[in-house]
């Protein structure tokens, strides 16, 4: 299974999930990263779009592995949407 995070503009707004796009074997998914996760990673820098982009880039492999695991376990969501949070990535600093 091939999972890739796609480059895109990020919209960063406090208390709102940060949405990224990913492909899973050619199918596009919208992946929402919960705000609590972004805050855990970045603390006070969470409102800085550049810092968020860098944090996602640094954790790209971990994010792709979690997406892959979720798809293996449950299949590609019919809605084309997935949410990842502290439970999924909180320990992957």
Residue ranges and their predicted role:
Residues 19-44:
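A short, structured beta-strand/loop element
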Residues 1-3, 32, 50-55:
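A generic short-segment signal for beta-strand/edge and adjacent turn/coil regions
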Residues 1-27:
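Short, charged/polar N-terminal "headpieces" of proteins
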Residues 2-5, 28-29, 37, 86, ...:
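Intrinsically disordered, low-complexity regulatory segments
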Residues 44-93:
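Acidic, low-complexity intrinsically disordered segments
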């Amino acid at each position: 299974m091939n999972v890739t995070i796609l480059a895109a503009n990020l919209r960063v707004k406090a208390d709102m999930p940060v949405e990224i796009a990913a492909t899973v074997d050619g199918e596009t998914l919208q992946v929402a990263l919960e705000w609590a996760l972004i805050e855990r990673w970045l603390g006070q820098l969470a409102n800085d779009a550049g810092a968020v982009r860098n944090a996602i880039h640094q954790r790209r492999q971990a994010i792709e592995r979690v997406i892959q695991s979720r798809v293996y376990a449950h299949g590609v969501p019919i809605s084309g949407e997935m949410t990842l949070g502290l439970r999924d990535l909180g320990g992957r600093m």
